[in-house]
Amino acid sequence: MSYFPAVNHISYEGAKSDNPFAFKFYNPDEIVSGKTMAEHLRFSIAYWHTFTEALSDPFGAGTAIRPWNAYTGMDLAKARVEAAFEFFEKINVPYFCFHDVDIAPEGSSLKETYANLDVIVAMIKDYMKDSNTKLLWNTANNFTHPRFVGGAASSNEADVFAYSAAKVKKGLEIGKELGAENYVFWGGREGYESLLNTDLKLEMDNLGRFFHMAVDYAKEIGFDGQFLIEPKPKEPTTHQYDFDVATGYAFLQHYGLQDSFKFNIEANHATLAGHTFEHELRYARIHHMLGSVDANQGDPLLGWDTDEFPTDLYSTTLAMYEILQNGGLGRGGLNFDAKVRRGSFEADDLFFAHIAGMDSFAIGLKVAQQLIDDRVLEQFVDSRYQSYKEGIGREIVLGNTDFHQLEAHALSLGEIKTRSGRVERIKAIINQYLLNAFA
């Protein structure tokens, strides 16, 4: 059975194409700075938003019309696998990602849940034999079920801690079996609503203990995927322990985990934390902690996680600038943790949305590489910080001075001349590059 009978293979047709089922800018075979676009971008499909999302909201029921929704239970899970691999093949993406409950329903017991997972994992593994699509990462959903009301690894209930560990243990086994290149930890409920009833130190210490156990078990079974933490400041909890990259990095350092983890950075989560996407990418990059990306965008007018498909070319350009400066994402990728809008409820909309996102990052890639080749931003930054390349500034950078010498230098100064930041000029130049890239 075909779940998308009206859709053929999605291919690159160029900017002048009016075919909605074609890439306008993403040409997977096009060479950009020695690598193909496909090698640079490493796109991934989010199983949950694409194949399980009902498009409901707090004010209304789901609107999604999906041919596989005629089934229920394990039959539905199997139909979703069939639909997923048809979708992967037609849009030609190299990777996909999932939570455990995305691919198989929870049973009435943990043992039954394991059995359901075993059936679907075997089916996915069989499909992967004839597919070019691989598993970028998998993870455990330790936030949806009511048992996680007080958290998972940070729960006030030791039984919930144990249950969460069992799910991650199974997830690591699945990751190894399916060849996952990474394993993600998103602490959806690892946080608190009120300090009045929270043992903050115990919860954070337990979270650290949990991560160490995960590292140990991965080594025990020979799972060599990269561990990734996905920061988010709030929602569903009021304050989450992995607020942003800086907070997460401090946590990892405090618990001696910084050599075992990197970060999976989501654009919309950066927005919720009061940061730009590129800020979070830059902070991770300069600390050698940039592992993977959840490619989406948020609505700056709203205060929650809208998970829109990325179409902001300014954002994709600055994101790709950071990724290119990082030397790529290594084993990571660009996972579309994004859902179509509630009014875009037909199955074809899934293709339109992913095409838009892939084209947007293709544009961002080419513009970012041109900015790097021409040293546009580097020239402005080098000029702005010129004072640290000579004189007292160079002595500061080299660690060859102290407060006594700096005071003596300051006393010898007249009026200090400062330099313009030229930020408006820089933004105008970026606009030029965006407009000229495909002119």
UniProtKB/Swiss-Prot annotation:
Q: How is the cofactor bound?
A: Binds 2 magnesium ions per subunit.
- Compartments where found: Cytoplasm
Q: What class of enzyme is it?
A: isomerase
A GO BP entry is: D-xylose metabolic process
Q: Which cofactor does it need?
A: Mg(2+)
UniProt xrefs under InterPro entries: Xyl_isomerase-like_sf, Xylose_isom_bac, Xylose_isomerase
What EC number is given for this enzyme?
A: 5.3.1.5
Which SUPFAM superfamilies has this protein been placed in? Answer: Xylose isomerase-like
Q: Which GO terms describe its molecular function?
A: magnesium ion binding; xylose isomerase activity
Superkingdom, taxonomy of origin? Bacteria
Q: Where are the transmembrane segments?
A: none
> Which reaction is catalysed here?
alpha-D-xylose = alpha-D-xylulofuranose
Q: Which residues form the active site?
A: H99, D102
Which ranges form a coiled coil?
A: none
Q: Which UniProt keywords apply?
A: Carbohydrate metabolism, Cytoplasm, Isomerase, Magnesium, Metal-binding, Xylose metabolism
Record HAMAP family: Xylose_isom_A
Similarity-based family: Belongs to the xylose isomerase family.
| Annotated PANTHER family | PTHR48408, XYLOSE ISOMERASE
Instruction: State what protein this is by name.
Output: Xylose isomerase
